[in-house]
C-alpha cells in the first residue's frame, strides 16, 4: 500500500528535520521540498560524516532516491549550483537525481540587497531574517512580477523581465533605503551562464509526482522552518515568508491533498528560536546556556546562536492542530541529560490579569502579554545519547516523554537520541 509522508517542524524551526527525513528515505522513492528557499539548514550525519543542506532535499544522500524541488520553493541559481558542487565533490550524484519545477520563482541579487537594506532600516525592530532574499522573492511572486525558472531559458524574455523588475527594486533601493543599486548587466550575464547547467534538471514536477504515486512509490515531503514561523499561523510578524504547515505540501508541489497521508511532527525535547520574536518559555539563565552548549544551538544557515527554553506543550498543541499531526518525533532528548529538574509549559497566564490560556494566542502582540505556567518533573543523570531501545532509557526520561504525549494529546512515533541516522528509537514507522 502506498503511503506518503509529510515531515514538518512543530516549533520555530531547527527541530532536526533533516536527520529524520534522511532516516525515512530508506522507504521512499522520492523526497520533495515544497516551500522556503536556501534559508533552510538541514543537518545530516551518516557514519560520522556531517552534511548541511540548504536547498536540495535531504534524500540526496540515498543513491536510489529521486529528489524534487517544487514550485513553492524560491530558488537561488547560485545557491543551487554551489550546493550541487559541494555534494558532487563528495561523490554524490545530484544532476541525475534532481528534478526542479520550472515554476519556481528565482531569488536574484536585488532580492538580497532589499532584504539587507530593509533589516538595516528597521534597526532594533528587525525580524531577524537570514538575509538571503527569501522574503522579497516571495513578495515578487505575490505581486506577480517574479521571474520564474522557466524564464531563464529564453534569453530575450529573461532580459526584458529582468529590466522591468530591476528598475522597480533599484528605485526602492536608491530612493527609499538610500543605498547602492544593483547592476543589470552583471545579473543578466551571470544568470544566463548558470542556465545551461540547470536546464537539464528542469521538469514537470506535478506530473512526475502523480505518476510516481500511481506506480506505487512512497513519497516524502520535506518541510522547512517550523509551523510557528508560518506566514499565516505563526507568531506574526516574526515569521518567515511562506506557509510551513503540512497543507503547503500540496500547494507547493502540485500534488493533490488526497495523496498526502501521514504527518510527522518533529519536536525538540526542549524549545529553541533563532532571531527576534516572542518566546514564552525562553531561559535567560544558566539552564538556557546549558541547553545551548550541549545542543550546539547555533543556526546551520546563519551561525547565529539560538535562544533556548523549556518544552512548550501549548505551542506544540497549536502546531499539531493546524498540521493534522499523526505522530510526533522527539529529537535531542540527550541534550537534557544531567539536569536535575525539567519543566513543561502546560498553559499561559496573562501578566495583566488572572486570565488563563490553554491555546497559543495569534500574533506577537498577544503573546507579549502572557507568561508560562509550568509543570515540574524530575530529570536524569544517566547518558541517553545513542540509545535505540526505549526500555533502556532512564525511568525519569520515559516518564518525561509519556507526559509530553499526554499534554500534547498525540502519540510519539519516534525519538532521536543523537545526530546519526542510527541513533533513533522507533515505535511506529510513518510509512507503516
Curated annotation (Swiss-Prot):
GTP binds at residues 13-19, 41-43, 306, 332-334, 416-418. It catalyses: IMP + L-aspartate + GTP = N(6)-(1,2-dicarboxyethyl)-AMP + GDP + phosphate + 2 H(+). Mg(2+) binds at residues 14, 41. Keywords: Cytoplasm, GTP-binding, Ligase, Magnesium, Metal-binding, Nucleotide-binding, Purine biosynthesis. InterPro entries: Adenylosuccin_syn_GTP-bd, Adenylosuccin_syn_Lys_AS, Adenylosuccinate_synth_dom1, Adenylosuccinate_synth_dom2, Adenylosuccinate_synth_dom3, Adenylosuccinate_synthetase, P-loop_NTPase. Pathway: Purine metabolism; AMP biosynthesis via de novo pathway; AMP from IMP: step 1/2. Its EC number is 6.3.4.4. One of its GO terms (molecular function) is adenylosuccinate synthase activity. Its main location: cytoplasm. It comes from the Bacteria. Substrate binds at residues 300-306. Binds 1 Mg(2+) ion per subunit. It holds the Pfam family Adenylsucc_synt. The keyword Cytoplasm applies. PROSITE patterns: ADENYLOSUCCIN_SYN_1, ADENYLOSUCCIN_SYN_2. IMP binds at residues 14-17, 39-42, 130, 144, 225, 240, 304. GO terms for biological process: 'de novo' AMP biosynthetic process; IMP metabolic process. The active site is at residues 14, 42. It is found in: Cytoplasm. Its cofactor is Mg(2+). CDD domains: AdSS. Plays an important role in the de novo pathway of purine nucleotide biosynthesis. Catalyzes the first committed step in the biosynthesis of AMP from IMP. Belongs to the adenylosuccinate synthetase family. NCBIfam families: PRK01117.1, purA. Homodimer. This is Adenylosuccinate synthetase. It comes from Nitrosomonas eutropha (strain DSM 101675 / C91 / Nm57).
Amino acid at each position: 500500500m502506498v503511503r506518503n509522508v509529510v515531515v514538518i517542524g512543530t516549533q520555530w524551526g531547527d527541530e532536526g528535520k533533516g536527520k529524520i527525513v534522511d532516516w525515512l528515505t530508506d522507504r521512499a522513492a522520492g523526497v520533495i521540498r515544497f516551500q522556503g528557499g536556501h534559508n533552510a539548514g538541514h543537518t545530516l550525519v551518516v557514519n560520522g560524516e556531517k552534511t548541511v543542506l540548504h536547498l536540495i532535499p535531504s534524500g540526496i544522500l540515498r543513491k536510489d532516491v529521486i529528489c524534487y524541488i517544487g514550485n513553492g520553493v524560491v530558488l537561488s541559481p547560485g545557491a543551487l549550483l554551489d550546493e550541487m558542487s559541494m555534494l558532487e565533490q563528495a561523490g554524490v550524484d545530484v544532476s541525475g537525481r534532481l528534478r526542479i519545477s520550472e515554476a519556481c520563482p528565482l531569488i536574484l541579487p536585488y532580492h538580497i540587497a532589499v532584504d539587507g537594506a530593509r533589516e538595516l532600516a528597521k534597526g532594533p525592530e528587525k525580524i531577524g531574517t537570514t538575509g538571503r532574499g527569501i522574503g522579497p522573492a516571495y513578495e515578487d511572486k505575490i505581486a506577480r512580477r517574479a521571474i520564474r525558472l522557466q524564464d531563464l531559458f529564453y534569453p530575450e524574455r529573461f532580459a526584458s523581465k529582468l529590466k522591468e523588475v530591476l528598475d522597480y527594486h533599484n528605485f526602492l533601493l536608491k530612493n527609499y533605503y538610500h543605498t547602492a543599486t544593483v547592476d543589470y548587466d552583471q545579473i543578466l550575464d551571470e544568470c544566463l551562464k548558470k542556465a545551461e547547467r540547470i536546464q537539464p534538471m528542469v521538469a514537470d514536477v506535478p506530473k512526475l509526482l502523480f505518476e510516481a504515486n500511481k506506480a506505487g512509490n512512497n513519497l516524502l515531503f520535506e518541510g522547512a522552518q517550523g509551523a510557528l514561523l508560518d506566514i499565516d499561523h505563526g507568531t506574526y510578524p516574526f515569521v518567515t515568508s511562506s506557509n510551513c504547515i503540512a497543507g503547503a505540501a500540496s500547494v507547493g508541489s502540485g500534488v493533490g491533498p488526497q495523496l498526502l497521508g501521514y504527518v510527522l511532527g518533529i519536536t525538540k525535547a526542549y524549545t529553541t528560536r533563532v532571531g527576534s520574536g516572542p518566546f514564552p518559555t525562553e531561559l535567560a539563565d544558566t539552564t538556557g546556556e546549558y541547553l545551548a552548549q550541549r545542543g550546539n544551538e547555533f543556526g546551520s544557515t546563519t551561525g547565529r546562536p539560538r535562544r533556548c527554553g523549556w518544552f512548550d506543550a501549548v505551542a506544540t498543541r497549536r502546531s499539531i492542530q493546524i498540521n493534522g499531526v499523526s505522530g510526533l518525533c522527539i529529537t535531542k532528548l540527550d541534550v537534557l541529560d544531567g539536569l536535575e529538574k525539567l519543566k513543561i509549559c502546560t498553559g499561559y497566564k496573562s501578566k495583566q490579569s488572572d486570565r488563563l490560556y490553554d491555546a497559543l494566542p495569534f500574533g506577537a502582540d498577544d503573546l507579549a502579554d502572557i507568561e508560562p505556567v509550568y509543570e515540574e518533573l524530575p530529570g536524569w543523570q544517566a547518558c541517553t545519547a545513542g540509545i535505540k531501545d526505549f526500555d533502556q532509557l532512564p525511568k525519569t526520561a520515559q516518564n518525561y516523554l509519556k507526559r509530553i504525549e499526554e499534554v500534547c494529546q498525540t502519540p510519539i512515533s519516534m525519538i532521536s537520541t543523537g545526530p546519526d541516522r542510527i541513533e533513533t528509537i522507533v515505535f511506529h514507522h510513518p510509512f507503516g
